[in-house]
Curated annotation (Swiss-Prot):
<feature type="binding site">
    <location>
        <begin position="281"/>
        <end position="283"/>
    </location>
    <ligand>
        <name>ATP</name>
    </ligand>
</feature>
<dbReference type="InterPro" id="IPR006195">
    <property type="entry name" value="aa-tRNA-synth_II"/>
</dbReference>
<feature type="binding site">
    <location>
        <position position="297"/>
    </location>
    <ligand>
        <name>ATP</name>
    </ligand>
</feature>
<dbReference type="InterPro" id="IPR010978">
    <property type="entry name" value="tRNA-bd_arm"/>
</dbReference>
<feature type="binding site">
    <location>
        <begin position="368"/>
        <end position="371"/>
    </location>
    <ligand>
        <name>ATP</name>
    </ligand>
</feature>
<dbReference type="GO" id="GO:0016260">
    <property type="term" value="P:selenocysteine biosynthetic process"/>
</dbReference>
<comment type="function">
    <text>Catalyzes the attachment of serine to tRNA(Ser). Is also able to aminoacylate tRNA(Sec) with serine, to form the misacylated tRNA L-seryl-tRNA(Sec), which will be further converted into selenocysteinyl-tRNA(Sec).</text>
</comment>
<comment type="similarity">
    <text>Belongs to the class-II aminoacyl-tRNA synthetase family. Type-1 seryl-tRNA synthetase subfamily.</text>
</comment>
<protein>
    <recommendedName>
        <fullName>Serine--tRNA ligase</fullName>
        <ecNumber>6.1.1.11</ecNumber>
    </recommendedName>
</protein>
<dbReference type="InterPro" id="IPR045864">
    <property type="entry name" value="aa-tRNA-synth_II/BPL/LPL"/>
</dbReference>
<dbReference type="InterPro" id="IPR015866">
    <property type="entry name" value="Ser-tRNA-synth_1_N"/>
</dbReference>
<dbReference type="Pfam" id="PF02403">
    <property type="entry name" value="Seryl_tRNA_N"/>
</dbReference>
<dbReference type="InterPro" id="IPR033729">
    <property type="entry name" value="SerRS_core"/>
</dbReference>
<dbReference type="InterPro" id="IPR042103">
    <property type="entry name" value="SerRS_1_N_sf"/>
</dbReference>
<dbReference type="GO" id="GO:0005524">
    <property type="term" value="F:ATP binding"/>
</dbReference>
<keyword id="KW-0963">Cytoplasm</keyword>
<keyword id="KW-0436">Ligase</keyword>
Amino acid sequence: MIDVKLLRSNRELFEKNCEYRGVDKAPVEDFFRLDEEWRSINRELNGLRSQKNRETRKIAELIKNNGDASAEKKAVEDINARISDLENKLKKIEEERDRILWTIPNLVHESVPVCFGDENNQLVRYVGHAKVFRDDIEEFKKNSGNSQDYEVLDERPKSHVDLGLDLNVIDLESAARISGSRFYFIKNRLLKLEMALENYAVDFLSQRGFSIVEPPYMLNLESMRGATDLETFKDTLYKIEGEDLYLIATSEHSIAAMLSNQFLEEKDLPLRVAGISACFRREAGAHGKDTKGIFRVHQFNKIEQFVFCKPEDSWDFLEEILGNAEAIYRSLGIPYRVVNVCSGELGRLAAKKYDIEAWFPAQGKFREIVSASNDTDYQARSLNIKYRTSEGNRFVHTLNSTAIATTRILVAIMENFQEGDRIRIPDVLVPYTGFQYIEKG
């Protein structure tokens, strides 16, 4: 939720911000219309309350002097009726105005490219040594800043589906039969690799000052509304029938809501929290995309970074959590690029977002594996998370970033570390798996 005082004094800024994001500016217009009604009613209420006080004093004086106060009493009754009517109107206007506030997006940071479409995200850097099938060289160069750091493959690597089935580490048919599309069984050494990824990420973040939590996998409506953009996530979230509960799409939502309506002490900031959880997504808006395999699924495990900090520190923390994610993928040896997400693709909460996109040689393209966002005070206002200072109470800033979404990284490893009919385990994970290869037999 945006700062009402900031909005009132910067109407044009917020209308322009809607244009930057490619969303309707009608909510801003509606807010100012309702806010003027709210101010007008408040002015009338203040006048009526003053009038009531004057009439009440007259009544007291008349009674004291044995005078007739019937006219004044009738006037007070009429004033009370009018006050009650206006207070009811004011409450309805406040509710509608506050509802509209939830729909006005966060201000885009000045460093965000103002444009639309993922294809216009701004390349920040490319890192790594890629394996590129000869037919995909131009695609790779175009999206890596014309990097020459690659080796040419004469044959396209196997898809993770074909490789997983050949090695008996993925079962999609059984999952589809008992659960439907976009579900899966991960088996044998691939499951051990997934567990190794999780343990590696947890150790990595623990060494960098993050506390580790496993949050609730369900949130009530109030918490979910405060933590995320329900309108954007309406095609993503699973609602529990007959309950005021939603399955989480990411542990970010639970961690953010964990401190809702709380006051923090300035000395305790920043708070770095890493959440490990299953995530559940309907993917209703992804019809026809990635229908085979485990890249885009209804259920997956994820390690999430989350930071509560002081406003003046949040932009440094955005670079920190992005750097943490990059360090993980560099250590794994997965080639990737970082993009500065353009204004039209940010979502309502983020003031700025970076994506990390890994190179997938079997698919011949970069695909998103990490999103790192600074939501400034927008999410904290929605959840009412403040900290105490010597100069008064302030809202914290909140930031989040994927560390590892396991199914997508499994696919990245399967495509980038194929060696014939086997998969080589990245060196940093061997101490966690206890083996160097996934192979037949």
